[in-house]
Amino acid sequence: MFSSKIRDLRVERDLNQEEVANGIGVGKNTYLAYEKGTQSPKLETVEKLAKFYGVPIAELVSDSETNIDEKLKSKIRMIESLDEPEKESLFILMEALLMRSKSREIQKEFR
């Protein structure tokens, strides 16, 4: 699970939550929520966590109990190979698609 993976990485490196939060540019309470699993980070924050810990994004998001399918793992590796401006463009597009999807769900609820 993502929350336990980032907690384990932090503990392995003998860091406190505030150090990690500062390292990735979020507040301590936000990072605490990531570790508790009560809040999910944006994709760009997952990328920052991966860089901070020096691990591939796939290691953070893959779950040994539920195994992300190989197609998704392949896509994550492709994203990791992009340069920063390309990643930023992709993340903006993904956020827009997710917001559009959420908006459609909300509209359906009020019909």
Swiss-Prot record:
SMART domains: HTH_XRE (SM00530). One of its GO terms (molecular function) is DNA binding. Keywords: DNA-binding, Repressor, Transcription, Transcription regulation. CDD domains: HTH_XRE. SUPFAM superfamilies: lambda repressor-like DNA-binding domains (SSF47413). InterPro entries: Cro/C1-type_HTH, Lambda_DNA-bd_dom_sf. This is Cryptic phage CTXphi transcriptional repressor RstR. It comes from Vibrio cholerae. The gene is rstR.
